[in-house]
Amino acid sequence: MQFSTTPTLEGQSIVEYCGVVTGEAILGANIFRDFFAGIRDIVGGRSGAYEKELRKAREIAFQELGEQAKALGADAVVGIDIDYETVGKDGSMLMVSVSGTAVKTRR
């Protein structure tokens, strides 16, 4: 499965648009509590543990996106948008969402 933020894939023609696909992953409140409790993990202004959790959530969202596209018979997803948003009544969770258009391509 190919993923692209652009509307086309270089060297390939889109032969069919299969539909919009999405993927989401939510990081619970524990990641924020752990993040602030482990603030000493920050090196050079960055937290390795927090970045690792965000990366994991993004990978889960992309996996869901790919599974939806595959179920539609697509071999690529184009026009991908990645969003990060706080959710929950007190904003204690972070949602990573990805969306794009599932397509069939030909070289």
From Swiss-Prot:
Gene3D superfamilies the UniProt entry points to: Hypothetical protein apc22750. Chain B
Origin superkingdom: Bacteria
InterPro entries xref list: UPF0145_dom_sf (IPR035439), UPF0145_YbjQ-like (IPR002765)
Cysteines paired by S-S bonds: none
NCBIfam families associated with the record: PRK02877.1
PANTHER family given in the database record: UPF0145 PROTEIN YBJQ
Entry similarity comment: Belongs to the UPF0145 family.
Record-given protein name: UPF0145 protein YbjQ
